């Protein structure tokens, strides 16, 4: 993958020259699970991935679209990535800073992340931990995690009077 992006950046190839890499970048089941959640809740996305430090927005959009996540590319929040500057080293600090600048999100958000070990995750603030769903990094989003996200968003919806 890194070679493909590097070759594209140097002008030695185009995005479409690496279609096989994009098609296999994300496993089909996690993409299906995320698409089902997207269709149900009309999600918007902010990325915390390290990719945002390597790719600009145009490149990120290309990777998302070519790898089957066009619905994510089309629904990125206007501030589509967390700010990695201003001394925020831990991902939890980056997410909290993003949320503090986007109070319009209220509690209408969920962090979906791979299970990462270490002090950054173990010491997440309680308010972030309550909104976080972790999936196995070698498996991705399964029906189990998607169910937890669905339950969280259903709890956030205003109750309907009959």
Region roles according to the model:
Residues 29-32, 46, 55, 90:
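Generic alpha-helix structural propensity
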Residues 16-19, 42, 46, 131, ...:
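Generic, low-specificity signal for short hydrophobic/alpha-helical stretches with a mild N-terminal bias
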Residues 1-40:
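Active-site neighborhood of HAD-like aspartate-dependent phosphohydrolases
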Residues 41-61:
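Substrate-recognition element of Asp-dependent hydrolases with the DxDx(T/V) motif
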């Amino acid at each position: 993958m890194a070679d493909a992006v590097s070759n594209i950046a140097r002008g030695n190839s185009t995005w479409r020259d690496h279609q096989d890499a994009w098609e296999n970048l994300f496993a089909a089941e996690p993409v299906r699970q995320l698409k089902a959640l997207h269709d149900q809740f009309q999600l918007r996305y902010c990325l915390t991935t390290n990719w945002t430090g390597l790719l600009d927005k145009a490149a990120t959009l290309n990777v998302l679209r070519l790898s089957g996540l066009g619905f994510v590319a089309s629904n990125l929040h206007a501030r589509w990535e967390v700010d990695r500057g201003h001394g925020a080293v831990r991902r939890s600090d980056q997410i909290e800073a993003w949320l503090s600048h986007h109070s319009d999100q209220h509690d209408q958000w969920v962090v979906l992340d791979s299970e990462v070990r270490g002090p950054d995750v173990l010491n997440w603030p309680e308010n972030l931990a309550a909104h976080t769903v972790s999936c196995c990094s070698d498996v991705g989003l399964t029906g189990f995690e998607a169910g937890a996200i669905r339950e969280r968003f259903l709890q956030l919806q205003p109750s309907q009077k009959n």
